[in-house]
């Protein structure tokens, strides 16, 4: 695995103080906070994308589901390769999927995102396991090793070729909206 030398990281931080904010930031997400967010959003008809950065997040979702605070079907986005979260080994991907299967049965849609250079490899693994994938510049700036992506569209085109090359089909936008029980742009007030 390629690691950025400590000195180079320090230079980036010194040169760009706004990047340094994440090195000592506490991300507060208490059970009371989560319950408030879930309850408030549900009251307003919000559909949740539940991002799970580690196995414990699946158990947190199960806790709130068992209490009736959040209702299935769930859209679970497993996130791989973020510092402090689950890794990018194939065993990690399988463990997240198996745990979600055990906890939620057929009451969830599973999608993945792989951060940084792991994006396409994680997408391929999940697609092969029947999962959905998410790609884009929010998650990775790279299209391939040492080459920056030019756009989200370039990454979507690449993952589409990858998935179709595996003999799998891509959902249409209407199929995806139906799967996720979304209204569609023509039925919202903005």
Predicted regions and their residues:
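C-terminal helical cap(s) of enzyme catalytic domains, especially alpha/beta-barrels
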Residues: 144-168
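Hydrophobic faces of well-ordered beta-strands that scaffold small-molecule active sites
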Residues: 14, 48-51, 72-78, 108-113, ...
């Amino acid at each position: 695995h390629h690691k950025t030398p400590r000195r180079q990281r320090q230079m980036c931080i010194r040169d760009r103080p706004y990047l340094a904010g994440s090195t000592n930031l506490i991300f507060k997400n208490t059970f009371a906070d989560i319950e408030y967010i879930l309850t408030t959003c549900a009251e307003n008809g919000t559909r949740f994308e539940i991002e799970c950065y580690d196995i414990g997040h699946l158990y947190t979702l199960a806790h709130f589901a068992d209490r009736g605070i959040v209702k299935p079907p769930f859209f679970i986005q497993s996130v791989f390769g973020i510092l402090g979260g689950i890794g990018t080994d194939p065993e990690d991907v399988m463990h997240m999927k198996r745990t979600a299967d055990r906890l939620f049965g057929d009451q969830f849609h599973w999608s993945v995102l792989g951060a940084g250079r792991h994006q396409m490899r994680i997408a391929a693994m999940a697609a092969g396991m029947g999962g959905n994938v998410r790609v884009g510049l929010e998650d990775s700036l790279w299209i391939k090793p040492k080459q920056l992506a030019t756009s989200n569209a370039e990454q979507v085109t690449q993952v589409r070729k990858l998935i179709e090359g595996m003999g799998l089909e891509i959902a249409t936008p209407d199929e995806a909206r139906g799967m996720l029980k979304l209204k569609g742009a023509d039925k919202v007030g903005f």
